[in-house]
């Protein structure tokens, strides 16, 4: 009798989530909007988003990221997080994230298990009227993740740069990929190739990494957005949540 564990779905089929997320976007249409307490409204057109994904993809390649490597984001729910995720996916690398309000121990419990090669971080965030500087937490995260070879800093609060920013393996978001974008290339991967890693709550021990693949998430998002939510190309979607 055949059993489910170990079953393969759509063997031989290849795709990439990033390709399907980007392929129908109109160049001049507003496709990604970021609204934050700490900076002006961000707006990216289809052409802008593809260019930014291409730039960050090139930057990741220059940092040695390739097929199967893990890339982690200690980022809020901002445009840079979406861009970094899509750029990571386009390479066949694997994304994972935690929200910056997580404490250092909670983040290390998660990222430490998946051994990321590159870490995206934010300098801080605003909660109500208060700026929350995460510089100390970033330093402790870096020290606790020996597999990280490069760190990319997103300046969300425009805080003064810490002394660690002078390290050659710490890169500013704006400088990633030399600030330039080329034509966007996307690598096809197997249907079940890992796309991103989420985590269980950790209530019964360490949080357990949960791996989702390109094929199943492409189908799941199509189902939820197009069928369950009846969304089309001109509709807008906001999910009020964090990256955790």
Predicted regions and their residues:
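AMP-binding/adenylate-forming domain of the ANL superfamily
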Residues: 3-35, 51-56, 70, 80
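AMP-dependent adenylate-forming
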Residues: 18-45, 155-162, 168
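Hydrophobic alpha-helical segments in the ANL/AMP-binding
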Residues: 19-23, 61, 79-99, 106-108, ...
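Conserved pre-ATP/AMP-binding loop-to-beta segment of ANL
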Residues: 28-30, 152-153, 164-199, 206, ...
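Conserved AMP-binding/adenylate-forming core of the ANL superfamily
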Residues: 32-86, 103-108, 169-178, 212-215
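Conserved adenylation A10 loop of the ANL superfamily
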Residues: 38-40, 197-209, 225
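Conserved AMP-binding
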Residues: 75-78, 99-101, 241-244
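Structural core segment of the AMP-binding/adenylate-forming
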Residues: 90-175
């Amino acid at each position: 009798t055949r059993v489910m564990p170990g079953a393969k779905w759509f063997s031989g089929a290849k795709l990439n989530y990033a390709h399907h997320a980007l392929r129908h976007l109109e160049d001049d249409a507003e496709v990604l909007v970021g609204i934050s307490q700490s900076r002006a409204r961000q707006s990216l057109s289809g052409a802008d988003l593809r260019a930014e994904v291409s730039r960050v993809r090139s930057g990741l390649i220059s940092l040695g990221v390739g097929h199967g490597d893990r890339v982690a984001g200690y980022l809020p729910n901002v445009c840079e997080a979406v861009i970094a995720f899509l750029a990571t996916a386009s390479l066949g690398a694997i994304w994972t994230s935690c929200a910056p309000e997580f404490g250092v121990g909670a983040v290390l419990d998660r990222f430490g298990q998946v051994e990321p090669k590159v870490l995206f971080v934010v300098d801080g965030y605003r909660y109500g009227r208060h700026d929350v500087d995460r510089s100390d937490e970033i330093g402790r995260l870096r020290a606790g993740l020996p597999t990280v070879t490069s760190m990319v800093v997103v300046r969300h609060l425009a805080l003064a740069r810490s002394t660690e920013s002078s390290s050659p393996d710490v890169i500013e978001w704006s400088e990633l990929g030399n600030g330039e974008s080329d034509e966007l290339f996307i690598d096809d991967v197997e249907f079940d190739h890992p796309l991103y890693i989420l985590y269980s709550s950790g209530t019964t021990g360490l949080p357990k990494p949960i791996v989702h693949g390109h094929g199943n998430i492409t189908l799941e998002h199509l189902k939820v957005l197009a069928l369950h939510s009846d969304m089309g190309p001109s509709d807008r979607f906001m999910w009020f949540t964090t990256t955790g």
